[in-house]
Regions:
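Acidic, His- and aromatic-enriched active-site or binding-groove loops in soluble protein domains
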Residues: 63-82, 132-155, 160-171
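CE4/NodB-like, metal-dependent polysaccharide N-deacetylase domain
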Residues: 98-140, 195-210
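Metal- or metallocofactor-binding catalytic centers and their adjacent structured scaffolds
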Residues: 253-368, 378, 740-753
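N-terminal catalytic cores of secreted or lumenal carbohydrate-active enzymes
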Residues: 1-95, 99, 107-111, 140, ...
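The substrate-binding groove and active-site-proximal loops of carbohydrate-active enzymes
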Residues: 10-27, 49-58, 81-98, 114-126, ...
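C-terminal (or distal) subdomains of carbohydrate-active enzymes
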Residues: 131-134, 158, 174, 183-185, ...
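Terminal accessory/targeting
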Residues: 1-45, 182-246, 261, 324, ...
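C-terminal domain-boundary segment and adjacent tail
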Residues: 8, 46-57, 61, 136, ...
């Protein structure tokens, strides 16, 4: 290309160092100007940052401009999509990224536009290796990006073929100088053209001749037409004004090929500290994804197939709140405190909507009265549901609300009975077996008396069928005593847990024993929301005291409660050279639980953070050296090296940490840590999981770990995360993604009724356990059936063998965008089979 393409655009962070509403006021001004320029200049085009949410945000305050906006979209002069929200690339789940593209393309079409076929990700902090497979599943053939390259970019150049582990490939175009190489042009068209001509000459003919005319939250330049004319005269070649879709096609055969992630800092800041900034946001995000992907979507799909109502509107509403939060400055936590508070508020809303939707879905299937009247009986039927495509035995916790034996009449007789707290300590049994009664930890549970919390019951539900439920009878009984002593050992079914004198755990899976688990590392952090920055002369955490309590219940549930108090420095000195001499006590409480029939250790970690400017990690020694570990990543399992990266000459030094999607495994020990996405594997075989990284600045200068600026220098005291923090982890033997997902999703129980849509002990969907994972079970976006998606994270081709408990009318192989892909899938009665390539995804539309 002798000439060049000028793309006028802005990059629009919906919230960052201003709140969403603060930026939306500026968005209204910016899009007003864009529409004026489109009307005045027939050659003008503008890219709305590749995210369709901008349309919603703008029209919410400018509804009278919808016709003008739709006219520009239909004419192809205003570019939007394919994303709904420009996301962070590494922290959302693969399914969340898929919903993002589904919603983005849907919204673009609703406004009359054609979503861009370019996967534009200008500013996210690195990218997963499976992006090419994701984008190919939506018919996107080009990836335009800035951050993430390591040393491979020296050989690849500005344009190359990026190949996913399954073999899918797209053309990648690297914005070497960012998405702003033609921003802030001089007012004089000739001067602006001269600057751009000099820039192009310096880049040479091998670089993509793409000029990105825009920057963060900037009003568009109004004289781009005159600049393009002047530049064409200087170059003696055509200068086009258009969108990224107007980029000329590049011959794939002549391009170098790259396979792997993009998580390097060779040419641009990677900013990996965001993987651990503001832990509550990460935990809330993962909880929402698990509720929607693991519970709400599957049961909405199956419930609809069984004749229940359509819950798609509720799912979309919840997903949109989650996706709003997956913009990189929101999910990454690198924003001001007001934004972080609003992000958590959206997650609370999404959690509430998801939980209520799930409860209603399960209650309908189990036949509970839609009016939820409490029958005047002394026993209650409960239904325990399994969200997995294989039988499960696991611990389940059921809320006693409503429960007749605990209900009293409040008010007039014509009003319903209400559940209130018991005046004495009740006991309960499930099918005659004792259950553990515990106070509810849910602050939203209704209370009618101030004397006691509402109650839950906990027990082990055995052999719950795949995507089905098991029915139990809950009855009142004498409350059995729980053994409470100072013992330090738990043991069941060949699984042993021992609390050491220092509060760490010894865990034995059969003959394989691991020592020193849950050791604590606490280091000073002089960095900011973007990067960890270690300080010198760090005393770390000094263990001050340890107490241990053992509780063993007749139900078979066994727990160790270990409380450790550490002395840590209060903060980092203002010069950031060392931590303060003044210390402060920091308390960490760990509950380790085992249960019969459940081959794992469940961990609940509660920290009350009292210190500032530090990173606290939980360490899991695996007992042997390690050159690498395995970790969950976007739509795959990936190997992570323990060796340092050669980062000589990099703009941003390579971190020793890495992001993960739920679990990390080395030397036979798997640490499941959903919502704690930062980990490290050391050469001596220690897995480290970051529990908290407390910082007080959005960005700072003078870091050892980063030479270039990253954002505005603003205090964010909320990111110090003072106060309580709770996280749930688990320990497993091996590296089984399915078992890790089971630990995360658990089981759920609801009150059962007399008119179930589904009979108990009926499996609705099962997947043969041969290494495949169920990635999605969801209603089809167009309402025509539902979609089953299977992931193969292994190096071998596998056959998916899916058995349904409902009659099937038709089966069709589809892409990720749920359009037919021409793939084959056999359908023999209730059994569907299809091949899944190594590291590949297969999606099937099921009609009933």
């Amino acid at each position: 290309m002798d000439g060049c393409l000028i793309v006028s655009h802005f990059h629009w962070d919906r919230e960052w160092y201003r709140t969403f509403e603060g930026y939306r006021a500026r968005l209204a001004d910016a899009v007003d100007r864009v529409l004026e320029l489109l009307e005045a200049d027939p050659g003008y085009h503008f890219l709305l940052d590749g995210q369709t949410v901008v349309l919603e945000d703008y029209l919410a305050v400018r509804p009278q401009r919808r016709a003008a906006l739709e006219t520009a979209l239909r004419a192809g002069r205003l570019g939007t999509g394919p994303w709904y929200v420009q996301p962070d690339s590494l922290l959302p789940s693969g399914e969340a990224l898929t919903r993002n593209l589904l919603y983005g393309m849907r919204l673009a079409a609703e406004y009359g536009g054609r979503p861009s076929r370019i996967a534009y990700v200008p500013d996210s902090f690195g990218h997963p290796a499976q992006f090419p497979q994701l984008f190919a599943g939506f018919g996107l053939d080009t990836f335009v990006y800035w951050r993430g390259n390591g040393n491979e970019i020296d050989a690849l150049g500005g344009t190359y073929r990026w190949q996913a582990p399954d073999g899918s490939a797209i053309t990648a175009l690297h914005l070497t100088d960012g998405y702003f190489n033609a921003a802030c042009l001089p007012d004089d068209p000739q001067g602006a053209a001269a600057r751009l001509a000099a820039y192009l000459a310096a880049k040479g003919s091998s670089a993509p001749r793409l000029l990105m005319n825009g920057f963060d939250h900037m009003l568009p330049d109004s004289h781009v037409g005159a600049v393009a004319t002047a530049l064409a005269a200087l170059l003696g070649a055509p200068v086009e004004r258009g969108l990224l879709d107007d980029l000329p096609a590049v011959g794939n055969g002549a391009l170098p090929v790259y396979r792997g992630e993009l998580i390097g800092g060779r040419l641009a800041n990677l900013l990996p500290g965001v993987w651990s900034t503001r832990t509550p946001i990460k935990l809330a995000n993962r909880a929402c994804e698990a509720l929607l992907e693991g519970w709400a979507e599957p049961w909405a799909a199956l419930g609809r197939a069984l004749g229940g109502p359509d819950e798609q509107p509720a799912l979309r509403l919840a997903w949109k709140r989650v996706l709003h939060n997956q913009a990189h400055d929101s999910l990454c936590g690198c924003s001001v405190d007001a934004v972080a508070n609003q992000v958590l508020g959206r997650y609370d809303s999404a959690v509430g909507l998801s939980r209520e939707t799930i409860t209603r879905l399960l209650e309908r299937l189990a036949g509970h009265d839609v009016e939820r009247r409490t029958p005047d009986v002394v026993e209650q039927e409960v239904a325990i549901f399994n969200p997995s495509p294989h039988p499960r035995t696991d611990v389940v916790r059921v809320a006693l609300e409503p429960y007749p034996a605990l209900s009293l009449q409040v008010g007039q007789p014509q009003f319903p009975r209400f559940t209130i707290a018991a005046l004495e300590e009740p006991g309960f049994a499930i099918d005659g077996r004792p259950v553990r009664v515990v106070p509810s930890a849910d602050p939203a549970r209704t209370r009618w008396l101030p004397i006691e919390s509402p109650l839950d019951v906990e027990f082990v539900a055995a052999d719950v069928p795949p995507f089905g439920y098991k029915r139990y009878t809950l009855s009142r009984t004498a409350r059995p005593a729980e053994e409470d002593d100072h013992g330090r050992t738990l043991e069941v079914d060949g699984l042993r847990v021992v609390a050491a004198e220092d509060g760490t755990l010894e865990v034995a899976f059969g003959d394989t024993v691991y020592h020193g688990l849950l050791d604590v590392e606490d280091l000073g952090d002089g960095g900011d929301s973007y990067d960890f920055d270690a300080v010198g002369n760090d005393p770390g955490a000094a263990l001050a005291s340890v107490t241990c309590r053992r509780l063993r219940h007749p139900s078979g549930l066994q727990r160790l409660e270990i409380s450790r108090i550490f002395e840590v420095p209060l903060a980092v000195h203002e010069d950031r050279e060392q931590r303060s001499e003044q210390g402060i006590a920091l308390r960490l409480v760990t509950e380790a639980r085992i249960a019969p029939g459940v081959p794992r250790v469940d961990l609940t970690v509660r920290l009350h953070n009292t210190a500032r400017d530090h990173r606290l990690r939980l360490r899991f020694p695996t007992g042997a050296p390690a050159t690498a570990c395995l970790a969950a990543t976007t739509f795959d399992v990936i190997g992570r090296s323990a060796a340092p990266t050669d980062d000589r000459g990099w703009v941003h030094p390579a971190p020793s940490t890495f992001p993960h999607q739920g679990w990390v495994s080395a030397n036979g020990l798997c640490v499941v840590a959903p919502g704690l996405p930062e980990a490290e594997i050391s050469s001596d075989g220690v897995i480290s999981i970051t529990l908290l990284r407390a910082v007080g600045w959005l960005a700072r200068y003078g870091l050892r770990s980063r030479a270039q600026p990253a954002g505005p220098v603003m205090p964010i005291d909320g990111a110090q995360q003072l106060g309580p923090l709770e996280a749930r982890l688990a320990l497993l033997a091996g590296a089984d993604p399915v078992a890790a997902r089971d630990a995360e999703l658990g089981l759920r129980g609801v009150i059962a009724g007399e008119r179930p849509l589904l009979a108990p002990d009926t499996p609705l969907l099962s997947l043969a356990r041969n290494g495949l994972q169920l990635s999605a079970l969801k209603p089809a976006e167009d309402g025509d059936g539902f979609v089953v998606r299977v992931l193969n994270p292994t190096d071998a081709a596998l056959e998916a063998d899916v058995t349904f408990g409902i009659a099937l009318a038709a089966v069709e192989s589809v892409r990720l965008d749920e359009t037919p892909d021409g793939g084959s899938a056999s359908h023999d009665g209730a059994v569907v089979r299809c091949d899944v390539p190594p590291h590949g995804l297969r999606s099937l539309r099921i009609r009933t």
